[in-house]
Every structure is written in structure tokens, then in C-alpha cells.
């Protein structure tokens, strides 16, 4: 196995032309700036207002279509509303290493023994899983302007497995991964991947807690102290590219680190409902933690979802979470790069 096959993640734009501002949005603009503590220079204010208005109108159109049953989720004006798609991609998402299909096939063969016939066990699995209710999941965090999305699901998956083993839920240090996994191939706040992060924890012999190595939203000098180690792993498992296998793993193992393809024009404004984006592809550019699954309405309605934990703060989505379409041909590549640690 090589890191090149895995998700590389930086962690999530077109500069608008000059246009007249919609004065009817003045009050809403001022309220939004206060809510999200936005401060601009006079020159920047106009540019940001134009972008914000374009996003507001796009969100309003989407939600009108939702009321007519044309889509399955609603969007909202949030912290990212003053950013173009390109600005958002540069800050949160970014670059992906190439995927080598030959090596993917090798992984699938090697991992077959981990999940013998798991795709036939679907009916025996629970209809709903939410590891938050079982104490496996720490609070939602916010990565900010650091492209560190790759680190959050790694700490999240380890936190869950350590809780399963010890009964203690300890928030682990994302900053430890950002500062110290460069020898494994990660690049701090520029980009990284989950494979390299798991490799670091495995070969380093431990990972510090958030309490002793807090998040700084920027890369620093590695200052890992083995005396402060709060978690160790014995290895990690890479799942075959299958939603059935992912379902089995989520139900029987716990929270699973994975990747998704983020369409910045819709994903970043998600509010509620089951996210289904026709423009999604197999191009993975963001990392999340799968903490459960289920369905909305009746099981036969086709509104099955994966419950994912994001790293964009509690003001995004369902207080930091999203329901993304499940059993829809690996929608947004949700099952393509799934991994979990052993402890």
C-alpha cells in the first residue's frame, strides 16, 4: 500500500463582476455580519457584499425548489456566504493525490478476510445507528482557515475506538497530527491525508490529547511529548469500496474515517435533509467521520442517509453534522476511502 492511493486532503468561488447592490438586503447583510463577526475594509466590503448577495439568491432559489419537491435538502446562509466557490476551495478543500486503481484492487483482496460476506449481513444490521448516543463521539470542532480536515476524522475514529476499549472519551490532538506527521507525507495546514495520519500515530507510538496539545489553526513545530500520550493504535483497516461493507463497519466497529467529494456551491451551505448532489463524482477532496446511518420517512422512501461529522463548527449543517445520501451508488464517494483504527 502507498499513500498515493489515499485521499489527500486540503481542507474548502469566481470573482464576481461589478453589479448594483440589492438595497432590500441591507438589514439582512448587517445582521449576518454581526452574527458571524465579519469586519471588512471599505473596498473589501463592496466585493464581499456582491459575493454574499449572489450566494443568498442561489440559496433562496434552491430552497424554493425544495419546497416544490425538486431536491431533498435545504441550504442556509452561513459563515461561508461571503466567499466565492474558488475562495472556499482554496481555504477548506484543495488538492488530491492521484488514485491508482491497481493498488486499490490489491487492498480489496488483502482486506477480504476482514469482512467475509459482510455484504450478505445487511438484513441483520440495525436500521439506525448513531454513535453519539453511545458516548463514542466528542464535540464538533472547527478547522478554520487551516486545511486540516484530514486530521479531524482520524482523531475522531481513534477517540471512538479508545472509548470502546476503556470507557473514557478523551478528545485527541488534531494539532499533534498537523505539526508532527510531515515525515509521513502530510503538509500541515497545506494538505494531508488520513492514511499518513494513521501511519504517524501507529509508528509514533501514541497521540496526545487536545488538553495537552491544543488546536491552533496553524502549523507549528512538533512538540509531541510521549509522557502526555493519551491514545495508541495497533494498526488500521482500509475498507473495500462498498457501502455495504461501510454499513457493516459503522454498525459493528464504531465511527469510521472517510472521504467525500465536496461540491462547494451546495455542500458548504447545507442546512438539513438528506444531501444528494447530482454533480458529485468520485473525486474525493474532503475528509469526514461517519458516526451513523438511518433513513428519513419510511424505509422504502429511498431517503437513506449516512450521518457524518464535519469539522466546520456547530453553526454548519445539523450543528456540525450532515445526512448524506446512502445506497445511491456510493454517492459523493462516501465509501471510497473509509478507514478505522485498531487499538
UniProtKB/Swiss-Prot annotation:
Q: Identify one Gene Ontology CC term for this UniProt entry.
A: extracellular space
Q: What processes in GO biological process is this protein linked to?
A: proteolysis involved in protein catabolic process
Q: Does the keyword Acetylation apply?
A: no
User: Which GO terms fall under molecular function for this chain's record?
Assistant: cysteine-type endopeptidase activity
Which residues are noted as glycosylation sites? Answer: 228, 298
Leader sequence segment: 1-20
Q: Where is the active site?
A: 149, 286, 310
Q: Which family does it belong to?
A: Belongs to the peptidase C1 family.
- Report what the protein is called: Cathepsin Q
Species assigned in the record = Rattus norvegicus
What is this protein's gene name? Ctsq
